Amino acid sequence: MTEADSSVLQIWGGHPLQGHVKISGAKNSALVIMAGALLCSGDCRIRNVPLLADVERMGEVISALGVRLTRQADIIDINASEIKTSKAPYELVTQLRASFFAIGAILARLGVAQMPLPGGCAIGARPVDLHVRGLQAMGAEVQIEHGICNAYVPGSGGRLKGAKIYLDTPSVGATETLMMAATLADGETILENAAREPEVVDLANFCKAMGANIQGAGTSTITIVGVPKLHSVDYSIIPDRIEAGTFLVAGAITRSEITLSSVVPEHLIPLIAKLRDIGVTIIEESPDCLRILPAEILKATDIDTLPHPGFPTDMQAPFMALLTLAEGDSIINESVFENRLRHASELNRLGADIRVKGNTAFVRGVPLLSGAPVIGTDLRASAALVIAGLAAEGKTTIQGLHHLDRGYDQIDVKLQQLGAKILRVREEPANAEVAVNNNVSPASIST
């Protein structure tokens, strides 16, 4: 059992936050850029890498391929001059969905790849059929048997061929997988209906910094002209827009004034628009700094999650927590993933009034939330419970921290620095009360 598995978060809510928080590097950029480093036969230095369980796991996957990888603070160095095996380890890939995306880079480098089907958060079906069909269009033979995806490029050269590929849906993972595969392919690849997320653009910029020929990233049509090889690079990834959004929502629900640095406001346009819509004031202090001011009244609103540049599905759960205390009735429609509203029942344990029908949540605002024991069911659901706990009267105890640690870089420490009364306790919930009573009181938590 890991530390996160045996830990709980205890939050004494009802306290405003104050101060400054620096946003970490983007989780979803870090994972795929680490996979992208497999395209390069030289040294890749990746900066601004967040300290996350998922990043550690991705490093284990890459190391298992025989690739040299070292980490110091927020810098990861990868040298894939020699990839000793094309077979990724089952026990690691099945725990981390993003590790499957490395199949494009491995296939491009070696002409063969064996990748178990992916794991990650249990938030509905996220098949890899778009990845497979795209690789097949580029000349790969792909078979899936017993949960293992086997791919190879027939012929003596073992090089993928450029192709025109239309994605049925703008899948981020498929766009990234096929873009990586195309960087070393023979000829031109055109991805139509491609994902437009900032992390896709970040991966494209990383590959371009290594010498790839990519145009159109950030639009629905991406054109890649394959090159024979890529060279060494020193690259810094973008800030995490979902972490930034989570702290903005935490500030809003606690009626706080906080400042966020290392952000890209352009990546937060749909979220900022919704926050302003419900009465929150957000000021752009500088090109990479935002300040949120307390709202007198939070108003209800409706949300439809959409692929970028729409409202991000990863902010749906945190924003639902915020709307539990808004005046009036809100409707949240989750249109990106099914089975991503399980946090509603846990928020109701805290006194929220949420009714779920299919992929739609109906949220009726309540005057206050009350602390209670709750369980995080996935990464963003866990963040929603933290946000609700910050506003709830009394103590909230959150289990399931292994989800939270997959995607947030020391969120409890950052919240403590903003004045939150929050503790991570390395004991089962039944014993946590004793530990807190014996060792620390809410008033003595460092702020």
Curated annotation (Swiss-Prot):
<dbReference type="Pfam" id="PF00275">
    <property type="entry name" value="EPSP_synthase"/>
</dbReference>
<keyword id="KW-0573">Peptidoglycan synthesis</keyword>
<comment type="function">
    <text>Cell wall formation. Adds enolpyruvyl to UDP-N-acetylglucosamine.</text>
</comment>
<dbReference type="InterPro" id="IPR050068">
    <property type="entry name" value="MurA_subfamily"/>
</dbReference>
<keyword id="KW-0133">Cell shape</keyword>
<dbReference type="GO" id="GO:0005737">
    <property type="term" value="C:cytoplasm"/>
</dbReference>
<dbReference type="InterPro" id="IPR001986">
    <property type="entry name" value="Enolpyruvate_Tfrase_dom"/>
</dbReference>
<dbReference type="InterPro" id="IPR005750">
    <property type="entry name" value="UDP_GlcNAc_COvinyl_MurA"/>
</dbReference>
<dbReference type="InterPro" id="IPR036968">
    <property type="entry name" value="Enolpyruvate_Tfrase_sf"/>
</dbReference>
<feature type="binding site">
    <location>
        <position position="336"/>
    </location>
    <ligand>
        <name>UDP-N-acetyl-alpha-D-glucosamine</name>
    </ligand>
</feature>
<dbReference type="InterPro" id="IPR013792">
    <property type="entry name" value="RNA3'P_cycl/enolpyr_Trfase_a/b"/>
</dbReference>
<keyword id="KW-0132">Cell division</keyword>
<dbReference type="GO" id="GO:0008760">
    <property type="term" value="F:UDP-N-acetylglucosamine 1-carboxyvinyltransferase activity"/>
</dbReference>
<keyword id="KW-0963">Cytoplasm</keyword>
<feature type="binding site">
    <location>
        <position position="314"/>
    </location>
    <ligand>
        <name>UDP-N-acetyl-alpha-D-glucosamine</name>
    </ligand>
</feature>
<feature type="modified residue" description="2-(S-cysteinyl)pyruvic acid O-phosphothioketal">
    <location>
        <position position="121"/>
    </location>
</feature>
<keyword id="KW-0131">Cell cycle</keyword>
<feature type="active site" description="Proton donor">
    <location>
        <position position="121"/>
    </location>
</feature>
<keyword id="KW-0808">Transferase</keyword>
<keyword id="KW-0961">Cell wall biogenesis/degradation</keyword>
<feature type="binding site">
    <location>
        <position position="97"/>
    </location>
    <ligand>
        <name>UDP-N-acetyl-alpha-D-glucosamine</name>
    </ligand>
</feature>
<comment type="pathway">
    <text>Cell wall biogenesis; peptidoglycan biosynthesis.</text>
</comment>
<feature type="binding site">
    <location>
        <begin position="27"/>
        <end position="28"/>
    </location>
    <ligand>
        <name>phosphoenolpyruvate</name>
    </ligand>
</feature>
<dbReference type="GO" id="GO:0019277">
    <property type="term" value="P:UDP-N-acetylgalactosamine biosynthetic process"/>
</dbReference>
<dbReference type="GO" id="GO:0071555">
    <property type="term" value="P:cell wall organization"/>
</dbReference>
<dbReference type="GO" id="GO:0009252">
    <property type="term" value="P:peptidoglycan biosynthetic process"/>
</dbReference>
<keyword id="KW-0670">Pyruvate</keyword>
<dbReference type="GO" id="GO:0008360">
    <property type="term" value="P:regulation of cell shape"/>
</dbReference>
<comment type="similarity">
    <text>Belongs to the EPSP synthase family. MurA subfamily.</text>
</comment>
<dbReference type="GO" id="GO:0051301">
    <property type="term" value="P:cell division"/>
</dbReference>
<protein>
    <recommendedName>
        <fullName>UDP-N-acetylglucosamine 1-carboxyvinyltransferase</fullName>
        <ecNumber>2.5.1.7</ecNumber>
    </recommendedName>
</protein>
<feature type="binding site">
    <location>
        <begin position="126"/>
        <end position="130"/>
    </location>
    <ligand>
        <name>UDP-N-acetyl-alpha-D-glucosamine</name>
    </ligand>
</feature>
